[in-house]
A protein has these predicted regions:
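PLP-dependent enzyme catalytic core of the Aspartate aminotransferase-like
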Residues: 163, 309-313, 318, 322-355
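PLP-dependent aminotransferase-like
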Residues: 96-150
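N-terminal "arm"/small-domain region of PLP-dependent enzymes with the aminotransferase-like
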Residues: 1-56, 143
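Phosphate-binding glycine-rich loop
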Residues: 63-102, 120, 300
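Active-site pre-lysine segment of PLP-dependent enzymes
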Residues: 134-143, 155-177, 181-213, 225-227
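Short acidic capping loops at alpha-helix termini that bridge into adjacent secondary structure
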Residues: 76-80, 101-102, 181, 199-200, ...
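Conserved PLP-binding catalytic core of the aspartate aminotransferase-like
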Residues: 268-269, 280-313, 329
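PLP-dependent aminotransferase class I/II
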Residues: 200-280, 284-287
Length: 355
């Protein structure tokens, strides 16, 4: 600890990302990367990057990318904000609109929310999810506080239907409602069509999960133009060039390839169902998921035992020590071959403990 640290820095509890091992022999089901490589159009765009593009600064407005997103979502480019992953987009959002404000989120959700709340001095209330990990919607209907809600939620995978999002936004008309759709495209209804009617709604997204671009770091927000203008003011007060030319070109190609997105998302849904069916047959409870992962616990075996046993067999999943979910594991949806290998290993683990 340096003597130059501010008290704020000393008191931070930073977010801890999932493990990224160097080995390529592991079956990596712990950080929810897409199971498939990105679209061929993305790889073509990367190959076509020129030295001149790298010599010059990138477009600070990312106009081509924003226009592609706007066309895909039937909104105006003025309603699109882009950043270096949805984490940066959300961080700017907290700074622009939630700093020092009362904010509600869930007690079992994305671990970065309390980090940003502490960083930006927000008064955070963590509303408990219900016994089945569904959202207590009535508890969030509070016009005294903004709401930040992951939908689908992580790590549970559960999602609210659009009509319940409408009810939430309607009941919090004088406070901002942020719907974090990092896991869009895998079955949940999107809140994007609601943006036109609500000046208190922001929808954020990542290309890491849906488009297989976790290594590229691209995210965006959709909201009415006045909110987007506020985000741009904050962005340009930190870094006018958050997205480099390579990221802008590749992300644009990804957004424009709707056929790849639909086919890849269906593949995830198909493998997810195979994993769910196979694990339930072994005595696992598997929560309903609208994401590219499942949240599971066994009816007799402790979560840490399963986690350690999987790791000893070169399969990584995600586990937390938090009391409420310590026996639960979050398992990313992999390829069909990875899913089949997971089921074989899980069967061995369960069988060894029941002999």
């Amino acid at each position: 600890m340096s003597r130059f640290w501010l008290d704020k820095v000393a008191g931070l509890e930073p977010y801890v990302p999932g493990e990224q091992p160097a080995s390529d022999t592991l079956i990596k089901l712990n950080t929810n990367e897409h199971a498939l490589p990105p679209a061929d159009a993305v790889l073509t765009a990367l190959r076509e990057i020129t030295g001149e593009q790298l010599r010059r600064y990138p477009d600070p407005t990312a106009e081509r990318l924003r226009s592609a997103i706007a066309a895909a979502e039937s909104v105006s480019p003025a309603q699109i904000f882009v950043g270096n992953g949805s984490d940066e987009v959300l961080a700017h959002l907290w700074f622009a609109f939630l700093k020092g404000q009362r904010v509600q989120t869930l007690d079992t959700t994305y671990g970065f929310y309390p980090v940003w709340a502490a960083l930006y001095d927000a008064d955070l209330t963590e509303v408990p999810v219900l016994d089945d990990f569904s959202v207590d919607l009535e508890a969030l209907k509070n016009d005294d506080a903004a709401v930040v809600l992951a939908n689908p939620n992580a790590p549970t995978g559960r999602a609210l239907p659009r009509d319940e999002i409408v009810a939430l936004v309607e009941s919090n008309r004088d406070r901002l409602v942020v719907i974090d759709e990092a896991y869009f495209g895998f079955g949940a209804e999107t809140a994007v069509p609601l943006v036109a009617g609500y000046d208190n709604l922001v929808v954020t997204r990542s290309l890491s999960k849906s488009h297989g671009l976790a290594g590229l770091r691209v995210g965006y927000a959709i909201a009415q133009a006045e909110l987007i203008e506020g985000l741009n003011r904050v962005k340009d007060s930190f870094n006018s060039y958050p997205l480099d030319a390579v990221a802008q070109s590749a992300a644009t190609a990804a957004i424009e390839d709707r056929q790849w997105l639909e086919a890849a998302s269906q593949s995830v849904r198909d493998v997810r169902e195979v994993m769910k069916t196979g694990l339930e047959a072994m005595g696992f409870e598997v929560l309903p998921s609208q994401a590219n992962f499942i949240f599971i616990q066994h009816n007799t075996l402790p979560g840490k035992h399963i986690f350690d046993a999987l790791r000893s067999r070169d399969i990584l999943v995600r586990r937390w020590d938090k009391q409420r979910i310590k026996n639960w594991l979050r398992v990313s949806v992999g390829t069909m071959a990875q899913a089949e290998q997971l089921l074989v290993v899980m069967r061995d683990i369960v069988s060894a403990e029941t002999i």
